[in-house]
Amino acid sequence: MDDSGESKNNGNSISFYKILDRITIIPGCNKYTADKEAFDSWITNVRTIAKEYGYEKAVSLSLGTFLSHSPNGEDGIFPHEIIRDFFEENAYESYVSEYLIPNFVVGKSNHEGAKVFWGSSSNHEKHMAEKYNNDAKIIKIDYPETSSILKRLSDSYEWSSKAVSSIDERYFD
């Protein structure tokens, strides 16, 4: 890594990002197993290797998208408690706040997709905004950092909902 924090291996970073972007089963936190130690060990190893080879930024970006594949927690709220613990423990690390969290929000939005029904007063985005806002309130005490992330996700859906409503008003009223 050079003094600017950018990877020296830009071409390889992009390839590494593409490889990580295709993985959707989180070690230690998936529908088959929930093992915090396995997850923590895996993520530590990934970060160590990324740092060693100068891929920190690319890996941080990719990890955000990757962790957005988390299953719901035992309480039915996304993300799983293991991922929530990761956010609570690492939220103030620059790689998490600058790269990982924004890509987590975008990644979750992207694989849920937009479901727009033109000319309809209700839409998927509005429903999702309400869901994530309610979930953020429910976990706020135990997982304040994750609650903040869910609020960002809710805000993203709220913005999309308003954009859809504006188009609806313009073209379907």
Regions found by a protein language model. Give the residues of each.
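Non-catalytic all-alpha helical scaffold/repeat segments
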Residues: 1-110
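Short, charged, amphipathic alpha-helical segments
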Residues: 146-156
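Residue at a conserved register position within TPR or TPR-like alpha-solenoid repeats
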Residues: 139-140, 157
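Amphipathic alpha-helical coiled-coil segments
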Residues: 157-171
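Short, charge/polar-rich alpha-helical segments
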Residues: 111-124
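Short amphipathic alpha-helical heptad-repeat segments
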Residues: 121-133
